[in-house]
């Protein structure tokens, strides 16, 4: 169940930043920093667009994703906002 929740959170986050065209900074496991907007994603990769160019990034290479501004995915009190 924890794996399903993590996948659902990942999909929810990526879909939100894609729909709202929120700029992201993505750090890869090798330290490379990428910036752009998510235009598409699936279970294995993310398509990142910047300055008219697209980059296909494999999720296993991603370390951290930082949105350009705060993202509110859940309303307070919703299941996804539970305290840990």
Swiss-Prot record:
CDD domains: Hfq. GO terms for molecular function: RNA binding. Residues 11-71 form the Sm domain. GO terms for biological process: regulation of DNA-templated transcription; regulation of RNA stability; regulation of translation, ncRNA-mediated. GO terms for cellular component: cytosol. InterPro entries: Hfq, LSM_dom_sf, Sm. Keywords: RNA-binding, Stress response. RNA chaperone that binds small regulatory RNA (sRNAs) and mRNAs to facilitate mRNA translational regulation in response to envelope stress, environmental stress and changes in metabolite concentrations. Also binds with high specificity to tRNAs. Homohexamer. Belongs to the Hfq family. This is RNA-binding protein Hfq.
């Amino acid at each position: 169940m924890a794996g399903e929740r993590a996948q659902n959170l990942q999909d929810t986050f990526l879909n939100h930043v894609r729909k709202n065209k929120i700029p992201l900074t993505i750090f890869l496991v090798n330290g490379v920093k990428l910036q752009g907007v998510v235009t598409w994603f699936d279970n294995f990769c993310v398509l990142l667009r910047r300055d008219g160019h697209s980059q296909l990034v494999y999720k296993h290479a991603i370390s951290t994703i930082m949105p350009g501004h705060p993202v509110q995915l859940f309303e307070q009190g919703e299941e996804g906002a539970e305290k840990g």
